Regions:
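Cleavable N-terminal signal peptides of Sec/SRP-targeted secreted and luminal proteins
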Residues: 2-18
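Carbohydrate-active catalytic/glycan-binding domains of CAZyme proteins
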Residues: 20-398
């Protein structure tokens, strides 16, 4: 009995010591270390002993962009005419009560299983708040365009739309699936003065040169402009954690950082894709990613651990990758229900505009269990600050 008591005390001490912080890195740079108490004080939107997990609030069913089960049309070859796969929310600069979502759909009802070559970019709108529901507004690209990321460049006074893919004018007679070996993803950018277009022709900025060690896919852009430094420089993060910068959105993109860890796929616990990169209010850098850990450890299972968080004081590193979950595929809803999705990928955040860079919403492409083509875009609020944001816009309960 005495031995058991001593062991319990030691385990408690060791656990408490393990949770202590010494530097802000111990708080994932998502908060500050209160050294007097050796505990982390997390920024809004983040929770956990090390502030490494998103504080996700319940989502509302049938918000986001969720039209995957609408009936197919006469020109569709399959049954998923409005399946979508993730996207990014942009608040209208002229009418703050209007929100835009840039996402992808799949032509001819081919759904997610036919993403290459059937994926194309659309713009959807919500007039009922940032959570949606969003409704189709217009088509932005031809096939094949996928994985869009859109940012506003204050220096250029333009919207910059990055995506992967190539324009393809083939007349389809059936749903197809084309491998990477035939169609490299590549990364291109288009620009517009207005979020409703017109959009300039896509210009390729990075090609998928695997022999050179670059897999150009999954773009995530961040303009470096600030009021103190009104630069036109752009940061572009891509899969396998390669980070590029360009002096302007039209300039040459030069490699500034490559992951120091093993980025090979399949058996690697650090395997990620779909980075979403940003700079916080302290000037530190972060990304959330689709983490493939269960695929590696559980015989290609795609759930429930799906999100990772990486951070660094400088863009050029060192970047810290804690092998722990930042979010899962288990989603709780406002009706009291919950659901574990088979896939939850393409994470992107919508931040507060007050300079605090508080994450208010996360978007993902999600797919239910036992599905292959049906998918939709989920919007989930984060923390509690989103309530004030919506209230100031006149949305939500009084």
């Amino acid at each position: 009995m005495r031995y058991l008591l001593i062991l319990t005390v030691w385990v408690t001490i060791l656990f408490a010591f393990a949770q202590c912080c010494i530097t802000d890195e111990d708080c994932s740079l998502n908060g500050i270390c209160i050294k007097r108490h050796q505990t982390c004080q997390c920024d809004a939107g983040w929770i956990g002993n090390d502030c490494g997990r998103l504080d996700l609030a319940p989502a509302t069913r049938y918000t986001g962009y969720n039209h995957t089960y609408e009936p197919p049309g006469p020109n569709d070859f399959n049954i998923w005419p409005n399946a979508s796969w993730g996207g990014r929310i942009i608040q209208d600069r002229n009418d703050k009560r209007v929100f835009h979502l840039f996402t992808v759909q799949f032509s001819h009802g081919c759904g997610l299983k036919g993403w290459r070559p059937h994926s194309y970019i659309i713009r959807a709108e919500s007039h009922t708040g940032p959570q949606g529901p969003y409704h189709y507004a217009d088509t932005v690209s031809k096939n094949f365009a996928h994985n869009p990321d859109i940012v506003y460049s204050p220096a250029d006074k333009k919207y910059l739309l990055y995506s992967i893919g190539v324009e393809y004018d083939k007349l389809f007679t059936k749903c197809e699936s084309i491998s990477y070996t035939r169609w490299p993803n590549n990364i291109s950018v288009s620009a517009a003065d207005d979020i409703r277009g017109p959009w300039s022709p896509f210009k390729m900025v990075l090609d998928s040169d695997r022999p050179a060690g670059i897999h150009a896919t999954n773009p995530s852009a961040f303009p470096l402009w600030t009021r103190r430094n009104p630069t036109r420089e752009i940061v572009l993060g891509i899969k396998d954690y390669s980070i590029f910068t360009a002096k302007t959105w039209k300039s040459k993109y030069e490699l500034k950082y490559q992951a120091t860890w093993n980025v090979t796929e399949q058996q690697n616990p650090e395997w990620t894709e779909d980075p979403f990169i940003w700079r916080d209010k302290r000037g530190h850098w972060h990304s959330i990613n689709h983490w493939m850990i269960d695929y590696v450890e559980n015989d290609k299972q795609q759930w429930p651990r799906v999100g990772s968080h990486l951070f660094s004081r400088k863009l050029t590193g060192p970047w810290h990758f804690k092998l722990q979950e930042a979010f899962s595929s288990n989603v709780t809803f406002t009706d009291g229900s919950w659901q574990v999705f088979k896939r939850r990928e393409r994470p992107k955040l919508f931040f507060s505009g007050d300079g605090e860079m508080t994450p208010l919403y996360m978007t993902n492409g999600v797919q239910e269990m036992n599905q292959t083509g049906a998918s939709f875009t989920l919007v989930q609020p984060i923390g509690t600050k989103w309530k004030d944001f919506e209230k100031t816009l006149g949305f939500g309960a009084p």
